[in-house]
Amino acid sequence: MILHILRRAEWDDARPRGEYRPPSLDAEGFIHCSTIGQVVVTANIFFSGATDLLLLQIDERKLLAELKYEVPATIGDERPRTPFPHIHGALNLDAVVAVAEFPCEVDGSFKLPPSIRDLPSD
């Protein structure tokens, strides 16, 4: 299971089309995803304080596009050593097995929602 963070409006736009194509797909050639062990760090670096987020739970076996685990150049000020899952193409929505609310805490930080905490970790 891999996870993708997105804004509610992006999800609402994708649903009628049956696929999700964020700007990163055109700009970088892939859709950024995270494992359960990576998603909170990702959210805290890139989405701190955002109040309109959702977490897509994606079954990678159902993806039509190629999935690659790649080490990013940087994440914020950090140079990670762990590869992140990247979807190299549009996300077919039938690969999304669940959508969870992903609210930030009062201080703007994130923690795993209960529905995600119960998933097997990587």
Predicted segments with their positions:
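Conserved, structured core segments of small domains
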Residues: M1-D122
